[in-house]
Curated annotation (Swiss-Prot):
GO terms for biological process: Mo-molybdopterin cofactor biosynthetic process. Catalyzes the conversion of (8S)-3',8-cyclo-7,8-dihydroguanosine 5'-triphosphate to cyclic pyranopterin monophosphate (cPMP). This is Probable cyclic pyranopterin monophosphate synthase. The keyword Lyase applies. It comes from the Archaea. SUPFAM superfamilies: Molybdenum cofactor biosynthesis protein C, MoaC (SSF55040). Keywords: Lyase, Molybdenum cofactor biosynthesis. It catalyses: (8S)-3',8-cyclo-7,8-dihydroguanosine 5'-triphosphate = cyclic pyranopterin phosphate + diphosphate. Its EC number is 4.6.1.17. Belongs to the MoaC family. Homohexamer; trimer of dimers. The gene is moaC. Pathway: Cofactor biosynthesis; molybdopterin biosynthesis. The lineage of its organism: Archaea, Methanobacteriati, Methanobacteriota, Stenosarchaea group, Methanomicrobia.
């Protein structure tokens, strides 16, 4: 049977990490947002009415990484050493990659995942008017594949 460290007697609780040593940690998370070709072109050309989409998404992701413990209840507040946010355009999508680094008592994967999620949501928010069809729906727009692609500890 799987043991969950965040549950004790059926109650949610924050795990006690106070006795753990500080260790260098890094996490890399990625995810994609699928968009219409015209929307991708507008982002590339810098012609989106709301402004620079990727610059805004980069700032939003960084802020989200720093605020992760405020929105995920059992996530510890950790000293972040670095956050990098990059975007790659593929065939019909933009991929966000967030790298988080810390020297602390617990991992930084939740921060990286939160950063990717908010980056992609910010992109959606900035281009939603271009993505809607005549019925106000989003037939192409899709966020998927949010995952941790790498986690390092002690290097």
């Amino acid at each position: 049977m799987v043991e969950f460290t965040h549950i004790s007697d059926g109650r949610a609780q924050m795990v006690d990490i106070s006795a753990k040593p500080d260790v260098v940690r890094e996490a890399v998370a990625q995810g994609r947002i699928y968009l219409r070709p015209a929307t991708l072109a507008a982002i590339r050309e810098g012609s989106v009415v709301k402004g620079n989409v990727l610059a805004t998404a980069r700032v939003a992701a960084t802020l989200a990484v720093k605020d992760t413990p405020r929105i995920i209840p059992m996530c510890h507040t950790i000293p972040l050493g670095a956050v990098t946010v990059d975007f790659t355009e593929g065939d019909g999508y933009i991929e966000a990659t967030v790298v988080t680094k810390s020297t602390g008592k617990t991992g930084v994967e939740m921060e990286a995942l939160t950063g990717v999620s908010v980056a992609l949501l910010t992109i959606w928010d900035m281009v939603k008017s271009a993505e809607k069809d005549e019925n106000g729906q989003y037939p192409v727009t899709c966020i998927e594949g949010i995952r941790v692609v790498e986690k390092k500890k002690g290097q």
